[in-house]
């Protein structure tokens, strides 16, 4: 089917689409076969009613089928957030990814430019000297040689160009804010996935279960799409096909609580400078919150069994210089494109 109207009518009547219907509808959207009015109407109908697990699974299935893929080890992990929390923090998941890479776990980092902050992962890494405009072969080399590679979302999801203008005109969150982090081009099956609202914790864990993920922690920390050290982090963890919910506090990581202002960042250049300060030995709130996210990621990866063991390994990665070396290698390999 190449006509969105039947799906638009069903969504407008507040009736959920089946998984197959959602897959077909998003194929129409992402193939350029729907008008801007149809795209906007359809996305807002889903938003107002509330997107279902089946609709998200169907949409992700279509998005994954159209993406430019990257080869990565089977045990690779991604540390990624939906964005949209409007917090303007430092690039926590970026530093956490480098720490995890330094600890010997391959990271296939998926990200984009800033959505609601001044610096997204792409802005931050670019300011650090990483070449983010590279193809799958170079990214695979980065993962092999630096234990971390960065996949710039807009280069891997070109079909998004068909819905981009409508999303900009709508000016509000749509289902597409959720789809990117669920569509890792390297097909990772282990993720630390931050979400902008706690209402999505269990639903997204269910989505990842239905899509075949092995271990995913979906987290929301005190308003952030990250594990936080400002207060309580809520977690929905997919492990061995089962979902459990729990909470984490700064004490669980052995760090002192901070306030949001302590981890507020700036633009890509400012955040790059802050990241390099931590690599240089600075002991501050940015270090603590990044270690916390890295520690959880090391548990998810299976490298360690407990958060405290994860903190020890993450701190060793930083303090031994392994994290800095991972960044240096990422910069070198990503720029070696002759």
Curated annotation (Swiss-Prot):
Residues annotated as binding anthranilate 1: 81, 112
Top class in the EC scheme: transferase
Sites where the protein binds anthranilate 2: 167
UniProt key word Glycosyltransferase: yes
Cofactor binding mode and count: Binds 2 magnesium ions per monomer.
Biochemical pathway: Amino-acid biosynthesis; L-tryptophan biosynthesis; L-tryptophan from chorismate: step 2/5
Glycosyltransferase among keywords: yes
SUPFAM superfamilies: Nucleoside phosphorylase/phosphoribosyltransferase catalytic domain, Nucleoside phosphorylase/phosphoribosyltransferase N-terminal domain
Any one GO molecular function term: magnesium ion binding
Subunit text: Homodimer.
Protein name: Anthranilate phosphoribosyltransferase
Organism (species): Rhizobium etli (strain CIAT 652)
